[in-house]
Amino acid sequence: GKVLLEGEDITRLSPQQRVSRGMAFVPQTQNVFVSLSVEENLEMGAYLRDDDFSGTMEQVFELFPVLKKKRQQPAGELSGGQRQQVAVGRALMTQPSVLMLDEPTAGVSPIVMDELFERILEVKKTGIAILMVEQNARQALGIADRGFVLVTGENRYTDSGQALLDNEDVRRSFLGG
């Protein structure tokens, strides 16, 4: 197969080339530079940019206000949820057209999980497409335009997020009732 991004085949491109074409990725774990400050982590996200990215950084701080307060603090001293915010913020510094998130709420408290989903919705409202893999299927489908339920690596169900939430088979088999 091949991967198209805005009509361009990016299958064989290097990660840097994919980023320059508009793709950003936030891995599930080890997704911050622990010895760098919050601000330095965000700057790392802008490494391919040759313009003034201060406006983008301010947008990230508006999205995640706690990061502005902790901008000089090493990312390794942050909570799990705050580290996730740094990782998403760093990805947003690339000004992506597609943001890929791998288990963004893994290992965070329910309160932080709700806040992260709210922030993901805010990102979505800016027009950035979001491709998310998430174990918390109910909450992910609740914000999804389109959902895919995979079973042993194969796509079993595809529909709008709400339709999948309303699907009795999906509810019974994957959502606990």
Locate each region found by the language model.
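Conserved catalytic motifs of ABC-family nucleotide-binding domains
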Residues: 95
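ABC ATPase NBD Q-loop/coupling interface
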Residues: 2-20, 161-164
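Conserved ABC ATPase signature
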Residues: 74-78, 82
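Catalytic Walker B motif of ABC-type/P-loop ATPase nucleotide-binding domains
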Residues: 99-103
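ABC ATPase C-loop
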Residues: 91-92
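ABC-type ATPase nucleotide-binding domains, specifically the catalytic core motifs of the NBD
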Residues: 13, 38-55, 63-68, 159, ...
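Helical segment within the ABC ATPase nucleotide-binding domain
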Residues: 113-126
